Every structure is written in structure tokens, then in C-alpha cells.
């Protein structure tokens, strides 16, 4: 062992929380920062990815037990599709990454790198639902999204690309849709508290913090120790 090798955590959680957290992530072997020129991106190392797989497996089982089917939609979304969801676009516009060239050829229409998938999933749900017999329809996607955050990034808290799941459903009535929302909120709460041993508070986001274009945004929130 070299004389200058640091053992344990040297930063103070109480007095320098940000640096303490970064040191924990590095020394626990959870992530590396991406190459120079890719600020805000991380490499998720095997240990952290295994944690994600366990969370994914737990949630995926809960979803499938309650009628959800997995699907996958394109990473790229035509600009015209985003424009159909103007409320969502306005909320994410500063964070959208765009592809405008393929090789040396300029694309006829710019393609957004998926910031969220409502605008690409909803048109297909409308095709798949032909009558009330097709309802409820429940689709889930495991994917990554890109949001070009201008604020300070931090591994696993706020990065420009991150892993997630997004569920999209269609229902015959508003009451059915609300019951579905509460069922999924229960499952998120179960995942935090029973799998991760993290107590959470559940509720609804205030008006200024709702998901762009949403009627209501429900949430489970954990307090940082």
C-alpha cells in the first residue's frame, strides 16, 4: 500500500456535504465522471448498476402483477411530434438536446433526444385503442432520458442523462385514471420503504412544480439525512 493512499472518507458530511457525497460515490465504486467535454454525464459502474437492476426487478414485478406491459419507443423524437405537446415542450425546451445532422447530411427535420416520451407514445396509444374493449391500456418503458441541465449536476441526483421508467395508461373514465395513479403511487412508496428502507412522504406537487402539461403531479419525497 502506498504511503499517500487515502483510506476512508476524508470530507466532512456536516460541513462540506457536496464534496462528502462525491467522495462517497467515488470510493464506493458507484460511478465515474464521463470524459472531459461531457460535463454532467456519468459512467454507472457495475455495483451501482446492480442496485438499479434490483430496483428495476422489484418494480417490474409489481407492474406486471397489475396489468402493465413493457414496450420500447425510439430514442429520437421528431420536432413535429414535440410541437403537438406544446405544454410539455415549453416546460422542457431549454433542456432538449437536438440531432440535426446524420454524418455530413442535414436532417429534413430535427430530432430531439428523448427528454420524456409522452409525445412519441401517445400517438401509438391512440392507434392501439379502438374501442372501450381495449381499455384500460397500460404500457411501461425502461429507458434513459437526456435533459441538458444548466444547473449544477451531481451523480444519481441530477445528471444530463439518467435511467428511469415511465408508465403511460389510457382509461375509460377520469375516476379509473385516478385509481391507477394511486395504485402506482402505492407501488413507488412500497419500493422506497420495503426495498430501500427509506421512509417517504406522499402528496401532490404545488402548481409551480407540476410536470409540464400535467393536471396533477403526485409524488413521494424522501428527506435527506
Question: What is each stretch, according to the model?
Answer:
Residues 2-225:
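TRNA-recognition modules of translation machinery and tRNA-sensing kinases, especially anticodon-binding
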